[in-house]
Regions:
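Transmembrane-helix motifs of polytopic, lipid-linked glycan transferases
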Residues: 4, 146-167, 389-392
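Perimembrane helix-loop-helix junctions
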Residues: 37-41, 241-271, 286-298
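Transmembrane signal-anchor helices characteristic of membrane glycosylation enzymes that use polyprenol
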Residues: 44-92, 101-105, 268-284, 464-471
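Lumenal/periplasmic acceptor-binding loop at the mouth of the active site in multi-pass
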Residues: 93-142, 310-394, 403-406
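Transmembrane-helix signature of polytopic, membrane-embedded enzymes
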Residues: 159-183, 404
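Short acidic/glycine- and proline-prone juxtamembrane loop motifs at membrane-interface regions
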Residues: 192-196
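Specific aromatic-rich, kink-prone transmembrane helix
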Residues: 199-216, 437, 441
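Membrane-interface alpha helices of multi-pass inner-membrane proteins
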Residues: 221-252, 266-269, 463-464
Length: 481
């Protein structure tokens, strides 16, 4: 039967319950001795159709984006790839720095926040260098598209697997929630834009699956497993490393702070990332910056129009950038002045889920206003439905240790964006770091609510998934075609 959930023995073997101490961190999951974790990247039989459909959908989205690119994106040789990509790529607030790295191995992304992103892209850069010599065309866009499709497809597989194995949903519910999650505008864009978010999303979903499986089996996360998860997750996006620490704490408790575990799981990866940062900064970034300053010194006297354009851009950014706590590193990205409630309505739960028709896919650093209102009042109604479904999911998952872990990770994102204001003006592009929590909690509502209420929530979720796919995909495809 297609809707039959995975075999389970009893509620106490799978589902969390309060221990006798009745404390927050003593929520327990009883072990399921029959399950082991082997070759987690092997696609299982029931996941094959999902993987195939996902791959085709994500490949199509990437093809649409590549089709929209100008001919200059495919030129090879000793060219100014910064000017080619940075000045002509505008998709919301996403960056095209990976295209530049794949073309000439120059680093323009913030190295301190993405210390191993260059290492992830390096094989692609080597491949592109060989292909450019062979084809005389820059294949960076195609290489990045392949990487994104693979990452997005496995993200869909792990999302589905978490729904099936850890939340214990039937296949139909897992399909509905997977379609619902990837119908979100920000997630759909994440699977096709040349930024780090799609890779970060995969790292986080793999981490949730591995740690959740350990908890379900009554096992502890091994130090080398935590080390690998922390290295990959924090290496792609440093702040996400905190979530690996949160997950390790939920799984292993205070043993996380034992000298041996802490050294292997966190200190060793930090040393590796620190060494990688130092090498790239000293031998790639600094020489690159010095060369750029030299070119600027020679060019500026001859091109006063460049200084004028830079002044206009700086004035725009000053007018639309919130006031930071300090100009010190990391603190310079904070924001204490942008209204929080409007950010939640229009950007966090707004643009993150449904694109605004006005100023479609424009970049805040170029021309997009901080806040845009929807053309249709019904868009706010659908946003309210998503929020209510999320709230219901939080209620029904309140006894789940797995969901408390995921919600704690999402709370860290809320602290970063809503309290500190990190990236608040473009908070919608960070949705891949946390928004999977919404459908995960909804899965518990499907499972635990009374049948009539559960069926009503399924129906609303299915309708929203179909609507968001039609609405967001139509806007994206027509925009790029």
């Amino acid at each position: 039967m297609p809707n039959k959930p995975p075999q389970k023995s009893s509620r106490n073997e799978i589902f969390p319950h309060f221990s006798s101490h009745n404390q927050f961190f003593t929520l327990t999951l009883q072990p399921n001795k029959n399950k082991t974790m082997k070759n987690i990247f092997k696609i299982k039989k029931e996941e094959r159709i999902l993987a195939l459909v996902s791959m085709l959908v994500f490949a199509s989205l990437n093809a649409v984006l590549i089709h929209s690119y100008p001919a200059s994106f495919f030129k090879a040789g000793k060219l100014g790839f910064w000017s080619i990509f940075y000045k002509h790529f505008t998709v919301s607030g996403f960056d095209a720095y990976s295209y530049i790295f794949l073309s000439n191995e120059k680093i323009y992304f913030e190295l301190s926040r993405h210390p191993l992103f260059g290492a992830l892209l390096y094989p692609g850069a080597c491949l592109n260098d060989w292909l450019m010599g062979w084809t005389h065309h820059n294949c960076a866009t195609f290489i990045m598209a392949v990487m994104l499709v693979i990452s997005a497809t496995f993200s869909a597989v792990f999302f589905f697997r978490i729904c099936r194995e850890l939340i214990q949903l039937c296949r139909l519910d897992a399909y509905i929630l997977t379609a619902f999650f990837f119908s979100f505008a920000s997630i759909m864009l994440t699977t096709m834009v040349p930024d780090h978010f799609c890779f970060s999303m995969l790292c986080l979903l793999v981490s949730i699956y591995m740690v959740g499986t350990c908890m379900a089996q009554g096992k502890q996360l091994k130090a080398w497993q935590a080390s690998l998860l922390f290295l990959t997750t924090a290496g792609v996006s440093l702040s996400n490393g905190v979530k690996t620490g949160i997950m390790s704490l939920f799984c292993n408790g205070r043993k996380v702070f034992s000298p041996r575990f802490f050294a292997i799981a966190f200190i060793l990866p930090l040393l590796i990332m620190g060494g990688s940062f130092y090498y790239q900064n000293e031998y790639i970034v600094k020489p690159q910056q010095e060369k750029g300053k030299e070119i600027e010194r020679k060019l500026m006297p001859k091109r006063p129009d460049i200084a004028q354009k830079n002044a206009v851009h700086d004035a725009w950014m000053d007018a639309h950038r919130g006031k930071s706590v300090s100009d010190m590193p990391f603190l310079k990205w904070t924001d204490v002045s942008t209204p929080r409630m409007e950010s939640i309505v229009e950007n966090l739960f707004g643009e993150g889920i449904q694109l605004h028709q006005k100023e479609l896919l424009k970049d805040l650093s170029v021309s997009r206003p901080t806040f845009i209102r929807y053309d249709w009042a019904i868009s706010y109604l659908f946003e309210a439905f998503v929020f209510l479904l999320f709230a219901a999911g939080v209620f029904y998952s309140r006894h789940s240790r797995l969901m408390w872990m995921c919600l704690s990770c999402a709370a860290f994102d809320a602290f970063l964006h809503l309290v500190l204001g990190f990236g608040l003006n473009e908070v919608y592009i960070m949705a891949a770091h946390w928004m999977f929590v919404i459908p995960f909690t909804m899965g518990y509502a499907f499972r635990e609510a009374q049948p009539k209420l559960a069926n009503a929530m399924r129906g609303v979720t299915l309708f929203l998934a179909i609507y968001f796919w039609a609405y967001n995909a139509t806007l994206i495809i027509t925009h790029f075609l």
